Each structure stands twice: as structure tokens, then as C-alpha cells.
């Protein structure tokens, strides 16, 4: 991402929103129409498992990792710099600092993003678990 802070910021905001949308769809499937009512894999389950590995694991997770690396390289140092200067921080800058730079603010950009990544991962695991296909770490 280099100096493209705005692009990274926008990516994180959009990712959090789209991950939340996708998580709601997964949860709806989990609770309203189980993928494997008998707890055994079926053709739909195999298709969903394929989407999980060929789309989410192969494409989405690497992109999330790229965004995380960019945030670590760009925004974490900015947050540290802002932290050091809190005693002279203008009141007009504080809302931006709280929402966009603070890593420890669960209601801010980074906190919401991390919550959505976690919730989305757990929803995938729960859906696949209905069929005995929950992925396990190697």
C-alpha cells in the first residue's frame, strides 16, 4: 500500500461491511436451513466446502492478510505517533484519531474490522461443522 493510506482505509471499511453481509448470510443458513440436517456431508455441503477453500481460503484470506500487513506498516506507526502527541492533540483531530487510528478501540475502524474477520471465520467454521467438515489447523 505504500503511501496510499486512503486506499487502505477505504479497503478496511469496505471489507468490514462486506464481511458482515456475508456473515449474516452464513448465519441465516446455519440457523434457518441447516446445510446438513443429518450431520453428514451431501452434494451441497461439498459445493460449499469447495467455495470455502477455492474462494475464501485461496483469495479472500490472502487479501485480508495483505490489508493487515499494510495496516501494520502504515497505520500502526501513525497511531503510535498520535499516541505520543495526545497531550497536544487538537480537539478537532480526536474523533479521527479515535475512529481511524486507535487499534484498541473496539468501536473504531480497526476494532470493527477485526471483529468482522473473526465473526466471518467463525460463521464459516460453524456452517461446515454442521456437516462434519469443519477445517482444522494443520
Model regions and ranges:
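A cross-kingdom marker for long, charged
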Residues: 3-138
